[in-house]
């Protein structure tokens, strides 16, 4: 090999240094296409990579300062790759461990940062994760031999794996259980607790376990007699003896209130009502309602309307004239200061029959709408000063319909219990579903939806408060 002498070279910046000797070996130059295409060629020819001896290190010393980019013949040789060496710890014939045919459960551990991991026995079996030691070749071969056994040896292999897993479990950190494993553990714990409670309830045990006598015979169980229900002897302030016995009287205005219940009612103990005073009627006025009739009507009124012993005349056909508008106006004036007052309208026809209606509120004009409540009723007055009321049936709520041209009380099915026009000249009565009343202008009881007309010779409206 020829000997080359280094040429001394100086520089103001770096000082004295010697240049590298020129190589006698012809170097190959790389072009831009070579650098870009080398990677593609490597990928394209990767399946057929051949091993080549590594080039001489002396030939790799290229003079990068004198590259010839125009020389096509000097290209970079194709890269060569040597196959990766096989690890010495793994045998070529080693295969992954096959899954055991026996179904095993997993440990479940808590990964809470504030508490130590807790291990539960949810499935009553312990799963073993084999600890592979890559350096233990004999153990690997032994496991491969065990893989070839059939179902008869599977149980033995599982037992050995469980024993080995228990021994090596202290070295293996428990992995965090998935969410569904924690849910199954919770359900299993809850089921166990529930079964324990059921067993305790079904078979109660006393704290004293010594349930046997000195002779060894069990003690007889003592049954306690059941307590008989106590008889309640005191009276209740919410119901009378008659109501408890089944003779309940419905309140006034409620469906089912009958005349028999009215006759059996007691007022102020066993004595009659105090005398009722009728005010506002002139002495020269022909009366329609007498004080005796008023006492009978008062017994049919709601309890709050019985508190007063004085009724006030609001309208009289004999005193104020035959005008429905006047009737509305006078009642409206009085109701301003007596809003809770009820009104009683009493009529006398050409045959001397007296009848009318009670409204739990003032009789006023309300165009196109019914008003009133179940306390309202129609009534007839007999010649013996007895009152026959016709209570609300609950079939509808057509209590009163008062407009400028007429006023009616009770309705349904095209029939009106009592209807009067604006001049009180065209009037009629029929059986209506709201009250199921008899025809009011008939002396004898008669029910018919065919209206019977009558002449209005007298009409009065009274305020009960």
Swiss-Prot record:
InterPro entries: TLDc_dom. Keywords: Mitochondrion. Residues 148-162 have a biased composition (Basic and acidic residues). It is found in: Mitochondrion. Residues 103-113 have a biased composition (Low complexity). PROSITE patterns: TLDC. Residues 20-32, 165-179, 205-218 have a biased composition (Polar residues). One of its GO terms (biological process) is response to oxidative stress. It comes from the Eukaryota. Residues 287-465 form the TLDc domain. Residues 1-61, 73-119, 144-183, 203-223 are annotated as: Disordered. Belongs to the OXR1 family. This is Oxidation resistance protein 1. It comes from Cryptococcus neoformans var. neoformans serotype D (strain B-3501A) (Filobasidiella neoformans).
